[in-house]
Amino acid sequence: MSATAKPKLYNSRHPERTLLYRTVAEHDETWLELASAGQFDGEGDHHTPKPFVRKAFAKYLECGIFAHGFARARCGDCGHDILVAFSCKGRGVCPSCSTRRMVETAAHLNDHVFPRLPVRQWVLSVPKRLRYLMQRDSATLNMVLRIFLRVIAQSLQAHCPGAANADKANLHIGAVAFIHRFGSSLNEHVHFHVCVVDGIFEEVAGAEAAAGGAADAEPSALGVSFHSVSGIDSNCVSQTQATLRRRILRAFVGRGLLGSFEAKEMLAYQHSGFSVDAGVCIEAHDRSGLERLLRYCARPPFAMERLRKAGSELVYRCAKQYSEPSSDKRGAKADELTLSPLELIDRIAALVPPPRTHRHRYFGVLAPNSPLRAAVTALAAAPAQPTTAHAEPTTTCGGANGPAPMGEPIAPKLKPAPPKRAAHYLWAVLIARIYEIFPLLCPLCGGQMRIIAFITHSADIRQILNHIGADSEPPHISPARGPPLWDDDGDAQMGDGVQTQPDWEMAAQPVPDYEVDQRVNW
């Protein structure tokens, strides 16, 4: 008889011990002073760090620190207590909270939004000169995203034999678009990852209307039929890329962001800078693969495990190779980024998203105001008993025939139950989903623990932490530091009682070998 495997136990993460936390705690105030003075972009007071960026770094320095408050959990069997520190719930800076948000988004989309149908990822990247405009203007970014989704819908309709004779007004796609504002080397790189159900949804009348009783049927009694696509290959992607290239450039010219002659030049480029990829497709039965894809699309811009220290500098290992300027103008490929602590903080600060800005958006039948959303998202749950409706033959991502997960048509019930809104995922459930460790498991008896109190008053926090022998003071945050003192016989002059000023010309930065506009060239 095999012994039962001992469950994994949850341990506090102690962010103050990580390299990123120590770097931010030591250099954040200095970076704020230098960034406000235009040290990094040369714009001075015109580019003072935004208040939400300051707040993101300040909240990160409090995240996971017991001295700033915690929750108390107790085991109902043996009475053992544990403390769980509060989190900042920030976006962009804190790796732990960004990971939690990533897992929660992927779990919600996988469990409650995407039906059990094939899902394909479409990725669009545009030239650098267009990225700059999209990064600074949300209306331009929305325009490009709408063009991308319309071209995807047209491409799917063209490769959908089952919807060839259908009314175009009743054909819809189902998609969730993720807006990435970052690249793999901590650079500003606006591009789109769109997860699209690999097929077309057709809006059809409900069962009452099909039986001839549409006179007294409710207008919302609609059904939906799914038609799969075939032939999404490299030729289809190339045609889609060429269409996007023309339409996006035409839209930029129409908005006055590009001249007509500039658009003609960009259309004539051999390497246009436009890139479309649709090679990743998840089968209908592979729900774990779909969740991994959604985590990749919802990932944060910074991965703490890729950061290491090399002397006085920091080295960040990039997921992909990037180009560095070289003397032959061809660029040298590198997969590691060497930065000073201030440069690292400045790059992370540029990637902090503004507040109340959506990181992903819903389109087609998955849009919140779509009348077909309830019928489509109901298929995201685990499959129930097989229905007697006729199943339309379909194809999977690889092109093999198989039974359609949806009949034709699928109509709602006469008295559908009121929709139940999906609850927020609990912190303990997300921890278990990521690390396969349930945090509210008693380390002594293995019993179930529950939260019994939230400690927020500073006096109570210090009393409890001092009682258990933990540090009751938060980690030290270094104040802003000025430039170093120069020692070119200044001590001798000071010894004579003469007050002298340092030679500020020695602190000037050397003239660069080449001029680079960092706002455009990533």
Identify the residue ranges that each predicted region occupies.
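Beta->alpha loop/short-helix hinge microenvironment recognizer with preference
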Residues: 1-522
